[in-house]
Amino acid sequence: IYRRIDSISYEASKIAIPNEYDKLMSAIGANGTNAFTSQDMTVYVEDIPSNQIDNWAKIQADRFKNPVIRGFHTELETIYEEKNMSLTQDSRKVWEAMDAALFPNHPYGTQTVLGTQEHLKNPSITNVRNYHKTYYVPNNMAVCVSGDFEPDEMVATIEKYFGDMQPNPNLPELQFEPEKPITTPVVKEVYGLEAANVMLGWRLPGANDKSTDISDIVGSILYNGQAGLIDLDLNQQQKVLSAYGYASTQPDYSSFLVAGRPKTGQSLDEVRDLLLEEVAKLREGDFDEKLIEATINNYKMQLMRSFEENDSRAILYVYSFISGADWADEVARIDRMSKITKQDVVDWANKYLGPESYAIIYKREGKDPDEQKIAAPKITPIVTNRDSQSEFLSEIQTSQVQPIEPVFVDYKKDMSQFEAQPGIDVLYKKNETNDIFTLIYVFNTGTENDPALNLAFNYLSYLGTDKMTAEEIASEMYDIACSFYMNAGANQSSIQITGLSENMGKAMEIVEGLIAGAKPDEAILENLKGDMLKSRADAKLNQSRCFGALQRYLFYGGDFIRRTTLTDPALQALTSEQLLAKIGGLMGKQHEVLYYGPQKEAEVKSALAKHHKVAADLQPLEKKFSTLLPTDANKVVLAQYDAKQLYYLQFSNRGEKFDVAADPEITLYNEYFGGGMNTIVFQEMREARGLAYTAW
């Protein structure tokens, strides 16, 4: 029957106009066309110019009211590939196993987002249409918008185009048997080629339960990336290769999750026991009460960051709608959280994080006995008819809208530059939006100059000073809602400090004090070396990491890899003195400082003079760029990986230099061939032939 469908689809494509949604979005200047599906929602995303709101609403209303399902069989092949991709994503296997263990009576656990292979082998376009008729109705959907528009005008426009949609009075309500309490650990195992790890999960009430505010605070007390119990007791103390934990909130049920990766020679059960010890501290109240206030301050800062962008503001509306929450409750959340006490946290942990009421998933290395690739049916490429178009598309293309005048960055007016001292140029831009600052020191040197730089930065994060231990540094930075990050690229290194502007001076003092006065610890260094070797071995088990390494080899060659990567013997030979000297040496080099925050130029200059401790006479650093290898012959570079699908890339470098005059043509060419869903490569590879999940 599929062969017959394929044949008819090909014949029909000769006379049919292809899917035009991507062309419509391009016509109105939209970006970021996307959609995603999770267990509780399907979300369609667009980033549109504010002068195209009317056209956008017209298109979307027609799309949801009168869908025409084109390219069904080629798009089905794409879903096959997505399913095959998931078979080699061990993290996805762990998630699905955890949901099955925690929610055996609820669709969270009884089915997956992608469905089973049998589901995908037996699709029904009739069922797709019935699903749309049932659920794509106004009493089951929301339009969540954020941006440059008048609210009343936006509401009127949405009413104009969506107002005649008919509700479904018989909209099905999800019926499920309430889950029974877990009284003894539920144990499951999954297998895959990637590195071993373990995850534990506890079932929680749904998003609208009053305890949800506490669950998020508890998640950050346990792990926040800086000063949580797992951060300080496990990661900082190097007791595991890595560990984390958090609360995952969903409408019907939520979950509290902790996970970890073992060090060399460490068993998954040992990691499990360490994680359980940290969770037990929540029940026993064995944590600093200051973590609650610090968590709330950091949550406020995260909200400020999310309010900087339209997409993150809109997604807050999405989550509120899906969970069925009142927006007023969302707005009042920080006020509620500020009233939570340590006893509230302890009581909550004893109620929901019992010592036996969890599920555990062991992700072990090995061949997955349940893995079965979906055999892709043979597809005859359909005719795309790119030159044919509907009257609707023509109408949108010829519609007249009020032009938006582009605003181009003027680097002389929109930002400023000044010299903090000879050898340190500052690029300054004032933050007019909120009270968050970002301060970055940028050095024109990297792993191509010294392959040990990243190890040096990593080592520094585990150390303390004469005045503060490493744990005290992490806790203090979290208390003041600030953080720092150090990284070395091939030719450039950076030290970044960010957080609440009122605490910038204190944060600079802590970070600069660590750089200047870190106390070496050989035991930490030896542990770190062992963890790096383990991480390298784990990376070789990951398909995308292997492909990334293959790309670097293809682009830059083996010499570049050798220059930028420490060999195992070279890694083992490094001493604390050598590593700390590398970081201290950076403060004797010329560099740039990038500042974005609410402080005035004079205040930034004063802060740098007071806290940024550098040599009086800074040595210059020559700016270098990694050299791409010329493509002088056809060749194939292959890295074998036992997966059900491949990562594929073609690359060519003719050695041409950048020409600013040619840049518009290059941009146009890239957009035409690979810039989106209506481009030549995507349409030929996915829509016409069903050969790839994504292509560009």
How does the language model describe each region?
Residues 150-190, 197, 231-232, 304, ...:
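Proteolytic maturation boundary segments
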Residues 80-88, 177-189, 295-306, 497-501, ...:
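Short, conserved secondary-structure transition motifs
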Residues 62-69, 162-169, 276-287, 513-522, ...:
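A common structural junction motif
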Residues 212-213, 664:
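Zinc-dependent metallopeptidase catalytic helix centered on the HExxH motif
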Residues 1-62, 93-118, 140-146, 195-206, ...:
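M16 family metallopeptidases and their MPP-like homologs
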Residues 120-124, 571-575:
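Short, charged, amphipathic alpha-helices and their helix-cap/turn boundaries
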